[in-house]
Amino acid sequence: MKKNLKILVITGGVISGIGKGVTSASIARLFRYDFRVTPIKCDGYLNTDPGTINPVEHGEVFVLDDGGEVDMDFGHYERFLNLNAKSSWNITMGKIYKKILENERKGKYLGRTVQLIPHVTDEIKSTIFQIASSENSDMLIIEIGGTVGDMENILFIETVRQIRQEIGSGNISFIHLTYVPSPAGINEQKSKPTQQSVKTLNKAGIFPDLIIARSSQVLTDQIRKKVAMFCNVESTSIIDNVDVSTIYEIPISFYKQGVHEILSSKLNIKVDPKIEELSKLVGVIKSNFFVPKKIINIAICGKYAELDDSYASIRESLVHVAAHLDLLIKSTLIDSNDLNESCLKEFDGIIVPGGFGGKGYEGKIMAIKYARENNIPFLGICLGLQLAVIEFARNVCGILDADTEENLARDKPLKSPVIHLLPEQKGIKDKGATMRLGGYPVILKKNTIAFKLYGQDRIIERFRHRYEVNNDYIDLFAKNGLIVSGFSSDFKMAKLIEIPENKFFVACQFHPELITRIENPAKLFLGLIKACI
């Protein structure tokens, strides 16, 4: 680990879900050009990772190149920093306790009583410093999940307090993201929740150097002075984080408010954020948000419709495409359980994303059929590919009982498994981290839509699945107009399908939304929207 390692710690207060991940990524972006920045997310839940958590409860599961299933905030880290994160950077209390219990069984504590302090905090510290060492990091951005005062994150808070004592206060800075409400009918900002949140943090031995106020409007001078007085910070160290048309405005806003200068002064470093390229792209997004040159309406037909964060990366992919094509994309999440054709008539394109289980199958299949028959641009992702195959088998090839082995809701034995379990998955009982996960090569067939979009015959994409297209049916599909345009590197598994006769009917087994960048939008989303214009 470098002797001059710098650490920024981001905590949250008042309520959860106010954007710590975006805030952390935005601050990290200001330092990315001058420092080797490594983002770390600390989550207090006892799951080893979020891979088995319902997206409606915790947001989408983000899959990394190394196969790790991590918190959705890593999507923000990767997109803002243009890097490929590692699963070890997501520290969960489940991982920490598992390691401690394993060490205890191995006798590594030499008969001592294993306690929360020092053993748990020491293990967290060790993990953090190991990451810094292995990545040769100049700077760590440590986001502590949840809200200050939660029982789940107390030990993470204590750990970063101890780290300050070990590396010196000049090498670490604490940033607190809080919420300043303006209750309806009062029309006045309230600082008391922020004061209480900071006092809770103070009781744990942490005194923030920077307070970032999440609110609907810029803080009034009165509120700013009040927060400064009762939270022991300079008024210049209280930063506005107001509602914006796109999250990519936030690094620019922080830059204009001098966040990088405040933190650089505290840490005794110099930085040049180089914000120009991002500013140009954000300018395009903002101009189309207020006065759109063209509007494209996209339906996202998914089963996790209760929470927008379930499909966060898909929405971001569309934002990236919009910035490059100079237009506005309006995406609407439609519950696949309530789908009917009348719901889809107003849309220029349709996306059927991934998911698990049989719930909502038939609604998605109906949407796919509607897109195919009406030549509406369509993109299927993961399960979306599998259901596109089922729809084609049933309605074009005449295999009326075509289905997937995953659908356990059948009342009859499956005779035509056009989608079946991956051979490597047979016999696996555990659910966590047992799928085909991570980055794998895909070989593209020349003279196909996919090949034209990517401009090369070999790509790397990220996967998260247990089921695949049954090769026994591929020739039949091809005879009827659906071809395989992308294969696994051994040519044994179909990874991309398309219908050449349609304007854009493409489906992939991988998740292209996981590698999109605002500087370089995912190619399949780019192709989808171009077909909608």
UniProtKB/Swiss-Prot annotation:
It is an enzyme of class 6 (ligase). UTP binds at residues 16, 190-195, 226. GO terms for cellular component: cytosol. L-glutamine binds at residues 355, 383-386, 406, 466. It comes from the Bacteria. Allosterically activated by GTP, when glutamine is the substrate; GTP has no effect on the reaction when ammonia is the substrate. The allosteric effector GTP functions by stabilizing the protein conformation that binds the tetrahedral intermediate(s) formed during glutamine hydrolysis. Inhibited by the product CTP, via allosteric rather than competitive inhibition. Mg(2+) binds at residues 73, 143. InterPro entries: Class_I_gatase-like, CTP_synthase, CTP_synthase_N, GATASE, GATase1_CTP_Synthase, P-loop_NTPase. GO terms for biological process: 'de novo' CTP biosynthetic process; pyrimidine nucleobase biosynthetic process. One of its GO terms (molecular function) is glutaminase activity. PROSITE patterns: GATASE_TYPE_1. The active site is at residues 382, 511, 513. One of 8 loci used for multilocus sequence typing (MLST) in Borrelia burgdorferi. Its EC number is 6.3.4.2. It catalyses: UTP + L-glutamine + ATP + H2O = CTP + L-glutamate + ADP + phosphate + 2 H(+); L-glutamine + H2O = L-glutamate + NH4(+); UTP + NH4(+) + ATP = CTP + ADP + phosphate + 2 H(+). Pathway: Pyrimidine metabolism; CTP biosynthesis via de novo pathway; CTP from UDP: step 2/2. Catalyzes the ATP-dependent amination of UTP to CTP with either L-glutamine or ammonia as the source of nitrogen. Regulates intracellular CTP levels through interactions with the four ribonucleotide triphosphates. CTPSs have evolved a hybrid strategy for distinguishing between UTP and CTP. The overlapping regions of the product feedback inhibitory and substrate sites recognize a common feature in both compounds, the triphosphate moiety. To differentiate isosteric substrate and product pyrimidine rings, an additional pocket far from the expected kinase/ligase catalytic site, specifically recognizes the cytosine and ribose portions of the product inhibitor. Homotetramer. Belongs to the CTP synthase family. This is CTP synthase. The lineage of its organism: Bacteria, Pseudomonadati, Spirochaetota, Spirochaetia, Spirochaetales.
